[in-house]
UniProtKB/Swiss-Prot annotation:
Disulfide bonds: none annotated. GO terms for cellular component: plasma membrane. Its EC number is 7.6.2.-. The keyword Nucleotide-binding applies. It is a peripheral membrane protein. Residues 6-226 form the ABC transporter domain. ATP binds at G42, E43, S44, G45, S46, G47, K48, S49. This is Lipoprotein-releasing system ATP-binding protein LolD. GO terms for molecular function: ATP binding; ATP hydrolysis activity. Part of the ABC transporter complex LolCDE involved in the translocation of mature outer membrane-directed lipoproteins, from the inner membrane to the periplasmic chaperone, LolA. Responsible for the formation of the LolA-lipoprotein complex in an ATP-dependent manner. It comes from Treponema denticola (strain ATCC 35405 / DSM 14222 / CIP 103919 / JCM 8153 / KCTC 15104). Keywords: ATP-binding, Cell inner membrane, Cell membrane, Membrane, Nucleotide-binding, Translocase, Transport.
């Protein structure tokens, strides 16, 4: 029997300036089924990245409840938020955020080391994840020695090192040329399926969105299935 990994109730988010008040979400109700790959499209400024930031505990909503797994994200203190981000979530952004003085392998291992796991314990898993994204032979290369697509593939591998339940990906191929974008996107879907993770993908590319299990369009504060 399927179950929901994320439940959102009454989510409200606004931005205010001196001249106007912009409503991003107005009492949004939404759920995400465990094990599904979903995509969110929408116009620039519609709130796609804001949605991911709120779900990821990187930004606060004005009101509403967000339950992700056993975490009540809307009411977590900073210590619990850190635990939520490091253990429950895997994050992939448009920019790779790799440390330039760390090799590909070391960059993949880093989140687990920060979480207090031993280097010996995680090295084998990090190598396996690099194999998943077809970069095992470049494990000792530094970011400057990798192409843009390869750097983003390292970021995909890194997102899985702490065995998260939910992967949040914000335009992960947005800075890549079409050929590299296709490679990275296919590998992201492949590793998500292999490791049985749930994926929430923000993209402007309708072709990529059509490859997910369910695609939603964010329009006027509502997520509508397309």
């Amino acid at each position: 029997m399927s179950k929901d990994i994320v439940l959102i109730s009454g989510l409200t988010k606004t931005f205010s300036s001196a001249s106007e008040k912009l409503v991003i979400f107005d009492k949004l109700n939404f759920s995400i089924e465990e094990g599904k790959k979903i995509s969110i499209t929408g116009e620039s400024g519609s709130g796609k990245s804001t949605f991911l930031n709120i779900l990821g505990g990187l930004e606060s909503a004005d009101s509403g409840e967000i339950i992700a797994g056993s975490y009540k994200v809307h009411s977590l203190d900073e210590k619990s938020l850190t635990e939520y981000r490091s253990s429950f979530l895997g994050l992939v952004f448009q920019f790779h955020y790799l440390l330039k003085d760390f090799t590909a392998l070391e960059n993949v291992m880093l989140p687990a080391l920060i979480a207090g796991r031993s280097k010996k314990e995680i090295k084998e898993k990090a190598l396996s994840l690099l194999e998943d994204v077809k970069l095992a032979e470049r494990k000792n290369h530094f970011p400057s020695q990798l192409s843009g697509g390869e750097r983003q593939r390292v970021a995909v591998a890194r997102s899985l090192i702490n065995s998260p339940s939910l992967i949040l990906a914000d335009e992960p191929t947005g800075n890549l040329d079409p050929a590299n974008a296709e490679t990275v996107q296919n590998l992201l879907f492949s590793v998500v399926d292999k490791h049985k993770k749930t994926l929430v993908l923000v993209t402007h590319d309708q072709n990529i969105a059509s490859m997910t299990d369910i695609s939603y369009k964010l329009y006027k504060g509502n997520l509508e299935e397309v």
